[in-house]
């Protein structure tokens, strides 16, 4: 990876690029890396954790997953992070706002809306979060004529070796699920990345991965009878060919 060397809060040197664009077509395959083993169970558990609006890591421990342990407090709490903001954003008068359900409802009634946005960057609560959101905002784009749904994600910070593969697959799965709920087909997943960085201690592994030949493309199957985002459960998701 080209780019200047930089130092960050971790104390590990990175190579960084600013303003990286990534586009992933979803109509014929599902994006999960095959040049290294990616723990799909962790991705699945995390996404459904987000969708439930939870902020405690107990469900991860019940599934022997430790990806959030580093940031949780002694009680397993992470503060008002992704799921809380997406499903219960605090309103001006003390009410909560379910951003994700509002987007789904709007796609159904007004698919050409330019307000199909879910944001996790609540400035007033950043200090209460154990880790500020990396993937900050996502915007859906519906094509009613073709019945295609796309998703653009803005990610302020992307660890390209470890974090980005998770984020790519997780958001692709989210797009598939929302598309099914509204009767559309998933089309494109797009990322706009602010700081895309490779840690110095990952460089050798990254070079090795680049030398590997990818396996056949994967496909995703969802339970076709689910039409509400809160009806979906992890058992509805089947990854074919991994």
Describe the residue ranges of each PLM region.
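Terminal, non-catalytic protein-protein interaction segments that mediate quaternary/complex assembly
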Residues: 1-242
